[in-house]
Every structure is written in structure tokens, then in C-alpha cells.
Amino acid sequence: MKRNITTALLITICSTMLGQSSFVPKSWTTSTDENGTVYRQSDGLTLYKHTKSSDHFDVYYGTGYGKTAPDKLSSSNALYVNVTDLLNKAESFYDLYVNKLKFADLSIKSKLNQYKMIICLLHDTGWTATGSGYDNTIGALWVTPSTCHPVGQTIAHEIGHSFQYQVYCDLGGYTGFRQSVGNGSTFWEQTAQWQSVQAYPDLMISQSIGLWQYNHNYAFTHEWQRYQSYWLHYYWAEKYGIDAIGRIWRGGTVSGEDPCQVYMRVFGVSVKDFFKEIYDYASRMVTYDMDAIRSYGKGSIGKYTYNYVDTGDGKLQVAYSSCPQSTGFNVIPLEVPSAGTEIQTVFTALPGGTTLAANDPAQYNNGEKYTTANVTKYNNFSEKTRRGFRHGYVALLKDGTRVYQSADTVYAKGHSTSAVNDTTTFVVPENTERLWFVVSPAPSVYIVHKWDENITNDDQWPYQLEFKNTDITGHVPYVDLSDTSIKPSDVTFDIYVGFAATTGNDYTGTTYNLTTAQLAAIGKALRIQPADIGKLMKTYSANQAKNTINLVPLNPKTNAVVNSGSTANGYGHWFSKTGNVCSWGNDSYVYSELDAGTLTFTIGQYPNHCKNGEVYQLGQGFRYKDNDGNVATAKLIFHIYIGGIPAGIEEQAYPHPLPQGKGAMFNLQGQRIGTLQKGLNIIEGKKVWAK
């Protein structure tokens, strides 16, 4: 017995000292040439036996390198690779994926204890990067030199695939997501991206945001966002630990399960609780409010596209292109009313397969662009009878605090053949900077999304919204223009903005988006649909054409139109210290430029001219000339506070005259007044400045 123990100990020590051995795939045949051993794959790829290795990787060079190894070439040569750096980085990824993310468990029978992973460095000036493995035994990757200039996130991604492949090599069964769900398994790409940005977290946003902002309403596992939709990985990792994703990859025991099904089984989560988590995840993703991503997501807060249709009866209906799938969600930006205001949302769940709203272009994003679906209804699918929704509010305060409000309620469940509505309320907190309404489906059954490149058979959960005391940011309302006897008329708005003085070459200031109420008032006054304002904009002309809008400057004393073309970029003007339109130069202090596509004003300054504490005024107007030659102007008077708007002055813009029912107005002595007076007024308990 003593002799046997000694022998076993000796074998263990020798194995440890020898380390992992090189693995030669079955598909490789061996020969030699003047430069040494040559391996030839069945597909014709030829490689030289490795000349450099590390603890866990062997590197094989394409035979095109001949006698000159890739790291012996000039660094300016396109085929040059710093192989030492490649191996060092590969070892760091190995350590991350094994010891932190737990894609392999070396304490059990793992083939990583026996063999080194394989890197095939191809002799090719093109771009190739693929990760997988050989013979269900060991992970491998195939890369060209261009992917190693420098070695970084691309190699981390492909070695991630190598470890995904390794899961099944070590555990077999239904682990490793080898079975396709439809035409493939999107979880491979999602996870490889997530793995790679664990090594390069500063890339997590740039690798995702371009498409994620358009397609987040799609299923988590949708093929058209498979490289961008790795954010649920972060939610699971925060909830269960950084090794949660590795546990999901290693946890498959049932044929054909997708990652969400494996997740629910591994962590004991019911379907109902799963969709409760999806809503919580969606709410946090509005502001990237998870520990691992919060600091990186600051610049992308709220950057989600939401397409909808104004039905003309006060309701807004989700467009086909934004209709959420069961593991997708919608982020709906809202205008921020005064603190303490109670806002209401009437949410109406529509039946699956409902006819699209009039004017819905019926488009979808295919991962590259928006294209037409050629449908007149939302998708019809068998699980539509299992309807349910979760929804609520997210507020971001000025100090960065997030406020979440939602009831633990599944709305509209079980009513699959009719529209069902509910009303939720939210009191706007003090110091709210931004506000959103979040919607995510919560059906009573989990729906597997299959990769098939066909939008029309995906599940969709349509609905309508109606708001009180707020509206969707940038909502361009529909106005009733049926009474053709009403002629265009002037309307005036006072708008208050603030920003700090600048020096050097800094011309920045702030931006201002016209509110829904302002757009509606402009449309009613000028007798045009607000959605047409940008379309009707034309370059200034003294002989303005009919059915066009010119952006014109205003006289600072009388608010009368000043006949002047643009003196700034595009539709824009520079203004002097006294508010008169001028050209760029020594007399210019502030400017305003309009983006006609978004109806956003960029308001800035001439550096070194403005001083903190000073107040400037500029006026611009949408001058509209209708088909009968009638002319009217919507006048915007911007009051610009350098250094910021003083506390106590209401930032909301009110039109002149105030809309009916806006509320009582008082002067600072508490006396009720009928019209706004110059200076400070009190409207609905708030101080408002009027010119």
C-alpha cells in the first residue's frame, strides 16, 4: 500500500511539472518540408508546428511564413505579429475565463488539464477571426495578423468562443449550447462580446449602443442584435455573481433549451418571476444602473429609440418597429413637469394581431437598417392569448439618484381578445432631471425566439398610451385644423435657458427642444400640423414663397420681425449684447441655430464675451405664409442666464396668451392679474419671468 501511494504521488508531481501537452487534431495530416513539420487540414489549410508556446496555448503559423516567423518580420509588414504579446494576452484571457468567469472547472475532469488550446495564425492580409475548437476536445481559434494589430478585444472575443466550445468538451450532454434554436444560437455571440468587454470594459458601450438603441424591443436572443444585446448578462451577474454566465453555459441538461430556459432552471426562477426580473432589468437599463456598467453608461443614459403613432384622439400607439417582444422592452422619455406634480399614464393593452395605427409605416430594423414589413397588422402568433404587461416610471435626479416606481402587478393578463386599460400615477420628485415610462411584456408562458430572419412570426405585444400632466419628449402632436375659416395668427413664447460663460474657443451653451404643448400651440396658431414645421422650412427670402416657413430674427424691443437671412450656421442667427441680430464678430454675444429635422435649438455664445451673472435675450420666429398669402409668426423669446437660471424662476416656457385653464396668475404682491406682467409673475405657485 505504501508503495502504491508513493507511485501515485510521483505520477501527480510529474504531470504537474510537465504541464499540458500539445493536441494534434484528427483532421491534421503530417508531412515535412525544408522548414520543418507541416500540418495540413482537410480543408487545405497548412500550418507549421508551433515555434512559440505559453502555459496554456500553442501557436501554429501558416506555411506562407516560410523560414521567417511572424514576429521576425518588420513591424511595418502587414503580416507581422508580436507573438509574445499575443500569448501574454491569451494567458490573461484564459485566467479571466477560468478563474473568474468559471467557463471551465479545472478541479474536475477538464481537458484543459491535459491539453493546450490552439491558436492558428494564418498567413493572410485579410481579416479573419474565428473561435471554436477541434474534435470536441480542445478550444481553438483561427486569426489573421490584422486582428492582432494590436491584440485586444477581437482576440478576447474569439478566445471566448474557444471556452464556450470547451464547455461541451468537458461536460458533454446538453451543455455549451451546441444545439441550434432555429438557424443558430445567438447566445454564442452575445456571450463572447460580454466576455471580451470584461477584459476591455471601456468598450462595452461602443460595441453595443449603435444597434442596441434601435432593437432593444426585440427578444433578448434575437438574431438582429446578437452582438449587442449582452446587457442581461450583467443583470444576471449582479444578481447571482460574476460566474453566473459560466453556470448557465455549464448548466444545460435538457435538449433544445435556450439560455433563458437554462437560466430559469439553474437558478430556480419561475416564469412569472423571470418576467418580473425582465422588467427590473429594463428599468435599470434606462440609466445603466448596475454596478459594473454605471460609470461607463453615463453618456448613454436614455438613448433608446421609441417609435409611435399619434392616433389623433389623445392616444399614442406603439409603432410596429418598436412593438416589444416578450424579453424586449420600451423606454419612453417623458417631459419633466414641476416637482410634486402627479402624472398619470393610461395604458391600454391591445390584442395580438391588432390592425396597425393609421400612418404606421410598418417598418422593422433588420440589424442594418429600417425596412418595410409589408403588413397591416401586428404579428399574429399562438401565444398571444397569454398576454400580460409590467410597466412603471424611472426618474433620474440631478444628483444621480434613481427613483423607481412600479407596482408588483401583471397588467392586462388573460384578456387576449379585447383592449384592456389601467391607470398608473407618479408624483415627480424634487430635483428630477429626466423621466421615463418603461414597458415590458409579461406573458404567462415563456416564448422561445427562433433565429429565422423573419420579423413577421415574432411575438409582439401592442399597446396605446395616454398621458396627463406630461407627454413623450419631442412628441409632435396632431391638431384639429378642420375649421378652415380660422386664419393664421401670431403666438409668442417666453423660454428660459442657462449655461456657464466660456473662454478660449468654446462656443457651447445648451440645447432646447420645443415641448408638445408649444408645438400644439404653434400648429393651432399657424394652422399647420406641427409635424410639418420642419418640412416647410426654407432658406430666408424677402419674397417668401407660399406654404413655407422662414426662421426670422425679432426686434428685441417690439418683437417685430426683422427681415434678415441667416447669420449663423444653417437656420440660425447671431445676436448682439442688446439682442439685435448681427453677424459673427466682435459685436456678437449669443446665437441660436435650429435643427429643422428635430426642432431642436442649439443656443451658444461667443467665448470671452458673456459674463456669469448676466442675462441676454434673443428672439426668433417661425414666419409662415399660407397658400392664400396670409402671414403669421410663432415668436420664441429666449431669455439666456449666463451662469445658470436663478433658483425660484420657473424654467417651463409659457405661451402668450396662456392657454385656457392654465391657472391663476399673481404678481409678487399676491394680487391676481389677468395677463403676464413684465418681470416675475407667480403662476400655479411658481415664479415665472415674462418679458
Tell where the protein language model's regions lie, with residue ranges.
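Terminal processing/anchoring signals of secreted or surface-associated proteins
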Residues: M1, G19, G648-E651, G670, ...
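C-terminal tail/sorting-segment detector
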Residues: M1-R3, L680-K691
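Zinc-dependent metallopeptidase catalytic helix centered on the HExxH motif
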Residues: G139-Q207
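Active-site-proximal alpha-helical
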Residues: W212-D291
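Beta/coil-rich, acidic/histidine-enriched accessory regions frequently appended to metallopeptidases
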Residues: E257-D490, Y496
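A short beta-strand micro-motif common to beta-rich folds, especially ectodomain repeats
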Residues: K611-N627
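Residue-level detector of functionally pivotal "anchor" positions at catalytic/ligand-binding pockets or at interdomain
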Residues: G643-R672
